[in-house]
Amino acid sequence: MSQEMTLQERMDGEGGSDPLRQAVKGAVAALAQAAIDISDLTCRGALAGITGQAQGRNTDGDVQKDLDVRADQIIRDALGKQPIAALASEEMEELDILNPGAPICVAFDPLDGSSNINTNMSVGTIFSIMPTPSDVNAAFRQAGSEQLAAGFVVYGPQTSLVLTLGQGVDIFTLDRVDRVFKLTGSAVKIPAEATEFAINASNRRHWDLPVRAYIDECLAGADGAGGKNYNMRWIGSLVAEAFRILIRGGIFLYPGDARDGYEEGRLRLVYEAHPMAFIVEQAGGGASTGRKRVLDLVPGSLHQRVPLIMGSIKNVQRLEHLHTVPDGALEANAPLFGNRGLFRV
């Protein structure tokens, strides 16, 4: 495998001339070009007029930044030239039907983590490609296991594109000289187990008992049930967290909790959880709500939210197991500060 293989060459190597396969290739190529244009904007920041200032709220109630709007338009313009039946975006209230007879539909989050723009942290784009069903209005009411392709782009120190076509995961890095994505990682595999976890620990008091028990195990380190010392990570950018997990393993948790509006988490199933779950499973990891496999979920609405726990398969399975333990048992076994220390002798 050549380190200089381009994304286009990799896609050409997939073979197949049927309309479905060709449409997927065209959509991926268009998304990659859009990502290059968005990368140019993020790199220039304030020099390109990117201030990170709020521009109101999107249809789902989240604060909308100026770059959210521009990234959304860049992607819509790129995909509008492809044989696509319908588009769905975080920034759009309803499905945008383009060509009902086309073979594929594309959902995307144009700029994940946009709250990080002002602090110069990584942001990204996430996308999911689905086959067009007989009723195009039901395009994104399909189980995640129906996805034809999924990917995400991280606009960080490098601009990286992570892609699965359902046969493993590849990573491409933007060559800024040639302005093309080049293959830098093939058949990526997530370690089966790792000692890093990512969660916003400030919300601990709102979590349900299984999540609290799992994090308590991690914090107990070698003295706890896991018998290992863990490190915590939290970037607040889904794409950055996912990329780290692909490279080093570990587990990411954005659970539902007891706060109003957070009962089902905050991540969207169609254009965040589904594509991430597809990628993570293709890399040998797991993706779950804690109780259900994410790829088995069928969206009830375009902007449905869902808890997301993903990463190294053994870590995810441990948390799933804790969801089967009665709450009384979890409370009885809750660690305080480990086997030894100020509060335990």
Curated annotation (Swiss-Prot):
Question: According to its UniProt record, which cofactors does this protein need?
Answer: Mg(2+)
Q: How is the cofactor bound?
A: Binds 2 magnesium ions per subunit.
Q: Where in the cell is it found?
A: Cytoplasm
PROSITE patterns referenced in this protein's UniProt entry, alphabetically:
FBPASE (PS00124)
As one GO molecular function, the record gives: fructose 1,6-bisphosphate 1-phosphatase activity
Its recorded reaction(s) are: beta-D-fructose 1,6-bisphosphate + H2O = beta-D-fructose 6-phosphate + phosphate
Database matches in SUPFAM superfamilies: Carbohydrate phosphatase
Q: Which UniProt keywords apply?
A: Carbohydrate metabolism, Cytoplasm, Hydrolase, Magnesium, Metal-binding
InterPro entries linked: FBPase_C_dom, FBPase_class-1, FBPase_N, FBPtase, Fructose_bisphosphatase_AS
Q: What class of enzyme is it?
A: hydrolase
- Pathway terms, separated by semicolons: Carbohydrate biosynthesis; gluconeogenesis
User: One Pfam annotation, family name?
Assistant: FBPase
Q: Where does substrate bind?
A: D112, G113, S114, S115, N200
Q: Which residues bind Mg(2+) 1?
A: E90, D109, L111
Binding of Mg(2+) 2 occurs at D109, D112, E272
Instruction: List this protein's GO terms for biological process.
Output: fructose 1,6-bisphosphate metabolic process; fructose 6-phosphate metabolic process; fructose metabolic process; gluconeogenesis; sucrose biosynthetic process
Question: What would be one Gene Ontology cellular-component term for the protein?
Answer: cytosol
Enzyme Commission numbers on file: 3.1.3.11
**What is known about its subunit structure?**
Homotetramer.
The record's comment on protein family reads:
Belongs to the FBPase class 1 family.
Q: What is this protein called?
A: Fructose-1,6-bisphosphatase class 1
Species of origin reads Nitrobacter winogradskyi (strain ATCC 25391 / DSM 10237 / CIP 104748 / NCIMB 11846 / Nb-255)
Name of encoding gene: fbp
